[in-house]
Amino acid sequence: MPEQDLSKVRNIGFIAHIDAGKTTVTERVLYFTGETYKIGDIDDGTTVMDFMSLERERGITIGSAATNASWRNHQVNIIDTPGHVDFTAEVQRSLRVLDGGVVVLESVSGVQPQSETVWRQANEYKVPRMIFVNKMDRLGADFYNAVQTVHDRLGANAVPLQIPMGAESSFLGMIDLLERKAFIYESEDAVQHKETDIPDEYKEDVEKYRNELIEKIAETDEALMDKFFDDQELTVEELKKGLRKAVLNLEIFPVLCGSALRHRGVHPLLDAVIDYLPSPIDVPSIKGTNVSDESIEIERKPDASDPFSALVFKVVTDQHVGRLVYLRIYSGVLESGSNVYNSSTRSRERAGRLMKMHADSREEIKEARAGEIVAAIGLKDAITGHTLCDQSNPLLLESINFPDPVLSCLLYTSPSPRDIRRSRMPSSA
């Protein structure tokens, strides 16, 4: 298996308050990238990512689901997370292993209570992210108010990368401020959008918000700032490079807009994911500690030549294959059927089979390399937060710590008639 260019990998998650349209965005991404040929619909219970019967029945995401797609010759590994406050742990475990995030906001309300929670969690793990203001076709949609709520409630430097053309039923598309081009959608089919010159009625707004964007980017880079104050024109490439650097440093959070339900704004969002969110080599190398002495720090680079290290971030039971252990591989190579060292339990385990997950479907692979997110079958003792590594080069990664529960209870199952009959039978001598 040829080694993958890690600069062309994106490990991202979609995070949001409930009903912001996060899963709908993910479904449109899968359709637009050609991973699915039929658009999943929450109301019809046909989504790819919400595959559990209870999720489809209630129309909400309960568990995080992993998938992958390809865009502009880049591999995009995606985790779709729940928006409901009761499933916050699913968001936390996902953010722990992701390199970047897309925060989906609803165009009417902007930042909502759970938006604040997931934003704090992303801050905790220093996850670079961008913002997608969804449902621009909804009654009461207000892009600029949504951006303002990010400033007011999150204290984040949110800067529009696009501005919408219209809102509510008159939402036609969006304008790319850096490129100075408009995307107009004339039908419900996302493929049918067209790039045009900026309509006259938006030219003044474009120059206003473009200048604000340029100034924000220049503030984060001394070389760009010098050119800006010398009244030298900054090229689009210079601005994109500066914006990417600012996003990676958590200095700017670019804002895009669209309507996922009507397929509008998906392809510019994907382009922005590739252009501005980090690859595994753009984020700091993972650091752990010596298994015997926690005061000794060990670093692993995202390279296949480094010793193997991975973190377990989720364990589920599949009705067809049994126990599935989800891993983020930080360094080295994991081969199917190989033995690994669980440094959390000080024991050896065997990764029998490796799977690349697409929601509830699986694609068996022979090996997985640094930067990938996969599932393993055969790991019997590994649980969430455990470190798997090369036994000859062990280390212990920081575990995943969940908030303490506010409620505890015991569940008792009703005994079956067979159990009752057994309890009444006299015991043998």
Language-model region placement:
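Positively charged, low-complexity/disordered segments
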Residues: 416-419, 423-429
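Structural and coupling elements of P-loop NTPases
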Residues: 1-414, 418
